[in-house]
Structures are given as structure tokens and as C-alpha cells.
Swiss-Prot record:
InterPro entries: ATP-grasp, ATP-grasp_RimK-type, ATP_grasp_subdomain_1, RimK, Rimk_N, Rp_bS6_RimK/Lys_biosynth_LsyX. GO terms for biological process: protein modification process; SOS response; translation. This is Probable alpha-L-glutamate ligase. Its cofactor is Mg(2+); Mn(2+). Residues 104-287 form the ATP-grasp domain. One of its GO terms (cellular component) is cytoplasm. Binds 2 magnesium or manganese ions per subunit. It comes from Vibrio atlanticus (strain LGP32) (Vibrio splendidus (strain Mel32)). One of its GO terms (molecular function) is ribosomal S6-glutamic acid ligase activity. PANTHER family: RIBOSOMAL PROTEIN BS6--L-GLUTAMATE LIGASE (PTHR21621:SF7), RIBOSOMAL PROTEIN S6 MODIFICATION PROTEIN (PTHR21621).
Length: 301
């Protein structure tokens, strides 16, 4: 098969692992820089040009779209869809999951466990917003943040008010969420491919830190999921319409709660902590499912 990986940097761990895994299975794998793709829109003749040349027809595309280029990246993925190419994650599913507020609204509609969350453009009383999620300690998140950037733990109501006022002064969109203290700075990353959790790791925040992201110095180890955690991850992926994603779960006193569904999860942490060949399993899924015009919109909203 001829397969394209959309990635800004072919030397990144995830990109290089995917390329190597695909080639080891006998596929031709091309790494394409998303921002160097030009979209040609013509009636009944959609095309993509790359570095001035028309791209060939690919059997499948693996999008690795960074948060900073979501709009353009999903436009490129959508153009591949118009050309009849199988995309492991559809453009609409990537957009859906990348919007933190939208994804939480859709997950809540289907009864997925979530932390109490508030959102307001200009609340009449900031104290009411804080009260509605249970008061301090609480977490304040920028809607556009990634890898733990733009996430603040406010330990008192007064501190929460100050942070919210500061963000609002910058006209930033924020979420206010209850702090799941019993998680003790740990979360679980479930790596979902198709309708299966193929690997899972428990990430522990570093000393004095509450964010467990590996980019922020957290550590990771293999973890065995409960049936409830596994079902939560699979259902969250289905609701987002993603064939490939990382579902981040916290263990709360009320059961598992979903913090995020990541449409472009990194492979390094999950492969090294679990010893599983995740990249190979991704290509196994593609081989079974990639057919011309096989994309069918999954998820709603």
C-alpha cells in the first residue's frame, strides 16, 4: 500500500516510528509536511499539490496534526477525503476532539464520566462560576492549551478569582474544572485503535506538580485497566468519531472521568512504558480497513 503520514517533522519519534513500522510491513510510506500542501478545488477533480507537484493517489493517510495548525491541517485531511483516500482519523473528528468545550459537551450528552466543568464568557459573578464546580481547589484551563500549557491549579477561591480575572482580561477562553484530588497527580493514557484499547500507561506528575504530562517531567508505567476504565476509553473514542486516539482518564471517587481525547497521541511514552509495538498495530488496523471511499463520518455533533 502507498501511505502518507501528515507531519511537520519526519524526525519526531512518532513520525519516524510510524514510517519504519509501515516500511517493515512492506508499504511505501511518505512523510508529507502539512503546511507545504496546496489544495486545488475543482469540480469533480480534487487535488493536492506538494512542493509544486501533484500528489499521487494514496491508499491511506495518517494525520499527525499539531494543535497550532488545526484549521489548515484538517482542511488538508478533508481534501484527501474528497479524493477518496482512507484517513485513519477524519477531519471532522479531529476538529471535534480538538475543541475542548465541544468535546466535553458531546461526552456529557452520552453519560461519560467527567469532572464538573464550567464555562462562561463574562460571568456576572465569578464566585458563582467557582461555586458551581465545587469551589477551590480547582483547575483553570485555556481552551487552546496543549501538553499542560495554560493549566493552572488554584488552591483558594481568592486565587481562582484572580486567575480567572487575569485570563478574562486577556480575552482568553477558559474552562473551570473541579480538582480531582484523589487522583494524586496521576492519570491514565489509554491508546485506542479501532474499538480496542491496545495499550495503557499510568502517568505520575513530578514532585510539586499536578500535571502528569510527560512533557512536564512526569513518569509513566504500564497499567492494567479496569473494565470500567476500558469501556470509558472506547466509548469516548467512539463519541469523538476517532479510530486512533489517546484518552486521558483520572481515577475519581465516582469512577473514571475523562479529561481529554487526543487525536494525535504521541507514541514514545506509550511504547517505552508498555513495551508494545503500537506503530505496528496502527498499520495492522489500516491494512484491514483502508479501502477507497471507505471514510464514513463517525460520531455526532
Amino acid at each position: 500500500m502507498r501511505i502518507a503520514i501528515l507531519s511537520r517533522n519526519e524526525n519526531l519519534y512518532s513520525t519516524s516510528r510510524l514510517k519504519a513500522a509501515g516500511e517493515a510491513r512492506g508499504h511505501q510510506v511518505d512523510v508529507i509536511d502539512t503546511l507545504h500542501c496546496d489544495i486545488d478545488i475543482a469540480s469533480n477533480n480534487p487535488k493536492i499539490r506538494y512542493m509544486g507537484e501533484e500528489l499521487p493517489q494514496y491508499d491511506a493517510v495518517i494525520p499527525r496534526i499539531g494543535a497550532s495548525i488545526t484549521f489548515y491541517g484538517t482542511a488538508v485531511v478533508r481534501q484527501f477525503e474528497m479524493m477518496g483516500t482512507f484517513c485513519i482519523n477524519e477531519s471532522v473528528a479531529i476538529s471535534r476532539s480538538r475543541d475542548k468545550l465541544r468535546s466535553l459537551q458531546l461526552l456529557s450528552r452520552k453519560g461519560i464520566g467527567l469532572p464538573k466543568t464550567g464555562f462562561a464568557s463574562r460571568p456576572d459573578k465569578i464566585q458563582d462560576l467557582i461555586k458551581n464546580v465545587g469551589g477551590a481547589p480547582l483547575v483553570i484551563k485555556l481552551l487552546e492549551g496543549t501538553q499542560g500549557i495554560g493549566v493552572v491549579l488554584a488552591e483558594t477561591n481568592k486565587a481562582a478569582e484572580s486567575v480567572i480575572e487575569a485570563f478574562m482580561g486577556l480575552k482568553a477562553n477558559i474552562l473551570v474544572q473541579e480538582f480531582i484530588e484523589e487522583a494524586n497527580g496521576a492519570d491514565i493514557r489509554c491508546f485506542v485503535v479501532g474499538n480496542k484499547v491496545i495499550a495503557a500507561m499510568k502517568r505520575q506528575a513530578g514532585e510539586g506538580e499536578f500535571r502528569s504530562n510527560l512533557h512536564r517531567g512526569g513518569t509513566a508505567q504500564l497499567v492494567k485497566l479496569t473494565k470500567e476504565e476500558r469501556a470509558t476509553a472506547i466509548n469516548a473514542a467512539k463519541i469523538m468519531g476517532l479510530n486512533l486516539c489517546g484518552v486521558d482518564i483520572l481515577q475519581s471517587k465516582n469512577g473514571p472521568v475523562v479529561m481529554e481525547v487526543n487525536s494525535s497521541p504521541g507514541l514514545e511514552g506509550i511504547e517505552k512504558s508498555t513495551g508494545k509495538d503500537v506503530a505496528d498495530m496502527i498499520f495492522e488496523f489500516i491494512e484491514k480497513n483502508a479501502k477507497p471511499n471507505a471514510n464514513r463520518t463517525r460520531g455526532k455533533g
